[in-house]
């Protein structure tokens, strides 16, 4: 499996991470990767191409795409674009998990055609337009940081979550999707614990015992799915938090 795990840390004081896509200047490729968080790409200008399970999903201005937890994907940005990225920790949807700790969303404006299993774009619905508008508002409020913005931004964020679970959540999924997700979910639980306890004296042996693995097996999990060893991954987490604290 040639893909990497992406470390995602929410913005300071907020229950999500929000930023402009790093490939906005075009001529950009993001290789296959995965993460626990749900990710929404909303294109404001230009276009992007996403690849999920080897299927291409073109995205143009005014459209969005939801990337599910543990969904391996890659991105191509051949031209200049302005794209808002919203990353939502999976725990925000705990109350809506299936028995297998699984939740999946779809984007109504980019669908699969059942006859040929290829994506087909449809005209955005009023709900799709509302979602795009909310994400624009979220980013505008985040940039302004006016007095009391923390309350306004949470109000908009929770309306986005409401649309996701009421309109875009899938209630039926294939068993193969559950199996693929479970393989990555095992490591996701460990990396989530590491992010929440990064200040502590974390050791491979201690985490292996806590989650029911041998030291050797857990070490292989990191090398296979995160593409780095345990020590490097822990250092990356601590460096990311240290950088955020330095900025603040």
Role assignments for model-derived ranges:
Residues 189-196, 201-208, 213, 220-248:
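Terminal helix-turn-helix DNA-binding modules in bacterial transcription factors
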Residues 18-35:
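Conserved short histidine dyad/triad with adjacent acidic residue
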Residues 33-50:
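Short, conserved beta-strand element in jelly-roll/cupin
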Residues 54-66:
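Short acidic-glycine-tyrosine-enriched beta hairpin
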Residues 44, 132-146, 191, 195-198, ...:
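Regular secondary-structure segments
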């Amino acid at each position: 499996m040639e893909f990497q795990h992406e470390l995602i840390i929410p913005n300071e004081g907020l229950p999500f991470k929000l930023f402009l896509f790093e490939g906005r200047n075009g001529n950009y490729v993001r290789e296959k990767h995965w993460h626990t968080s749900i990710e929404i790409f909303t294109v404001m200008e230009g276009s992007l191409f996403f690849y999920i399970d080897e299927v291409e999903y073109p995205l143009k201005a005014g459209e969005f795409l939801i990337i599910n937890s543990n969904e391996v994907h890659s991105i191509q940005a051949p031209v200049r674009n302005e794209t808002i990225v919203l990353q939502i920790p999976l725990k925000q949807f705990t109350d809506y998990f299936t028995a297998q700790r699984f939740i999946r969303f779809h984007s109504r404006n980019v669908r699969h055609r059942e006859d040929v299993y290829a994506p087909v774009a449809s005209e955005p619905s009023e709900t799709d337009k509302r979602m795009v508008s909310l994400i624009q508002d979220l980013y505008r409020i985040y940039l302004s940081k006016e007095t009391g913005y923390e309350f306004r931004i949470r109000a908009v964020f929770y309306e986005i979550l409401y649309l996701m679970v009421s309109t875009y959540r899938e209630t039926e999924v294939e068993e193969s999707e559950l199996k693929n997700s479970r393989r990555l979910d095992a490591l996701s639980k460990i990396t989530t614990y590491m992010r929440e306890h990064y200040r502590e004296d974390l050791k491979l042996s201690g985490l292996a015992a806590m989650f029911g693995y041998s030291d050797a097996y857990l070490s292989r999990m990191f090398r296979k799915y995160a593409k780095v060893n345990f020590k490097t991954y822990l250092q990356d987490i601590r460096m990311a938090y240290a950088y955020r604290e330095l900025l603040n």
